[in-house]
């Protein structure tokens, strides 16, 4: 078996993906499949931390457009990420692999508070660590959270799992002439306005010299393929 390219990574998953074909909520077969992929990645020898969005339950921006204040809407979204983390943690542990959810919020009855020390400890123990609650502050996306947490815990890369196999010049579902980039710099990603991640996330990755690999999670085993250096995606670095 090929040794993994990265010793420690943060994987960014969208909440919408966990909804499966139903489009809302948590689809258990999808959660189980993601859990299988994460477990397989851990078995390669890579230490795996995961940041999940909450858009399958609530999106703060959308809620705020309907009269709720933006900080309150974003807090609702951050709480939704905790639901996703707990669902995925349960699936991983049911399959026999230890996992641990750490929260940006103080909620002792539900989850331990995120600290760098706790994250390092659980990753070193071989657990898959699920990082919920976003940054704990409104106005920041879970993409930015993924880069922030990766920098904090010394991850070597952020793996951004999407429904397309990389960064394209335009939406490939709408524009048949769209071309996929094999590689971009952080600055090119920001200047190009590519919507796969927000500019704040790219800027923080540039500042902390963190590579981001954008890939499709649609095929089972895609995370492991990226970790072995044989996956198909776009590398944003430099």
Curated annotation (Swiss-Prot):
Alphabetized, the UniProt keywords read: Allosteric enzyme, ATP-binding, Cytoplasm, Kinase, Nucleotide-binding, Pyrimidine biosynthesis, Transferase
Q: Return the broad EC class.
A: transferase
The source's superkingdom equals Bacteria
Query: What Enzyme Commission number(s) apply to this enzyme?
Result: 2.7.4.22
In this chain, ATP is annotated as bound at 12-15, 55, 59, 162-163, 168, 171
The UniProt activity regulation field reads: Allosterically activated by GTP. Inhibited by UTP.
Keyword Transferase on entry: yes
Q: Does the keyword Transferase apply?
A: yes
Q: What is its main location?
A: cytoplasm
Cysteines paired by S-S bonds: none
Compartments reported by the entry: Cytoplasm
InterPro entries, A to Z: AceGlu_kinase-like_sf, Asp/Glu/Uridylate_kinase, Uridylate_kinase, Uridylate_kinase_bac
Offer an example of a GO molecular function term for this protein.
UMP kinase activity
Q: Which SUPFAM superfamilies match?
A: Carbamate kinase-like
Catalytically driven reaction(s): UMP + ATP = UDP + ADP
The record's Gene Ontology cellular component field reads: cytosol
- Which stretches does the entry tag as region Involved in allosteric activation by GTP? 20-25
Pathway(s) the chain acts in: Pyrimidine metabolism; CTP biosynthesis via de novo pathway; UDP from UMP (UMPK route): step 1/1
User: Which positions are annotated as binding UMP?
Assistant: 54, 74, 135-142
Gene Ontology BP terms? 'de novo' CTP biosynthetic process; UDP biosynthetic process
The record's annotation in PANTHER family points to: URIDYLATE KINASE, URIDYLATE KINASE PUMPKIN, CHLOROPLASTIC
Q: Which family does it belong to?
A: Belongs to the UMP kinase family.
Q: How does it assemble?
A: Homohexamer.
What job does the chain carry out? Catalyzes the reversible phosphorylation of UMP to UDP.
Kindly provide the name given to this protein in its UniProt entry: Uridylate kinase
Name the encoding gene, please. pyrH
């Amino acid at each position: 078996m090929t040794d993994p390219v990265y010793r420690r990574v943060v994987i960014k998953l969208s909440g919408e993906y966990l909804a499966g074909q139903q489009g809302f909520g948590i689809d258990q077969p999808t959660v189980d499949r993601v859990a299988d992929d994460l477990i397989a990645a851990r078995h390669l020898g890579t230490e795996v931390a995961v940041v999940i969005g909450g858009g399958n339950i609530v999106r703060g921006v959308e809620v705020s457009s309907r009269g709720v204040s933006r900080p309150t809407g974003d807090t609702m979204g951050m709480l939704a990420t905790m639901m996703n983390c707990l669902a995925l943690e349960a699936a991983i542990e049911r399959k026999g692999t230890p996992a641990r959810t750490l929260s940006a919020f103080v909620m002792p009855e539900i989850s331990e508070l995120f600290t760098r020390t706790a994250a390092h400890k659980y990753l070193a123990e071989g657990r898959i660590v699920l990082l919920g609650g976003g940054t704990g502050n409104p106005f920041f996306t879970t993409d930015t959270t993924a880069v922030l947490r990766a920098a904090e815990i010394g991850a070597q890369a952020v793996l951004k799992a999407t429904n397309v196999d990389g960064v394209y010049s335009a939406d490939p579902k709408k524009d048949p002439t769209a071309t996929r980039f094999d590689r971009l710099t952080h600055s090119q990603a920001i200047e190009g306005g590519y919507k796969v991640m927000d500019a704040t996330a790219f800027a923080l990755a540039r500042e902390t010299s963190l590579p981001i690999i954008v890939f499709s999670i649609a095929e089972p085993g895609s995370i492991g393929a990226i970790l072995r250096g044989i996956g198909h995606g776009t590398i944003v670095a430099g």
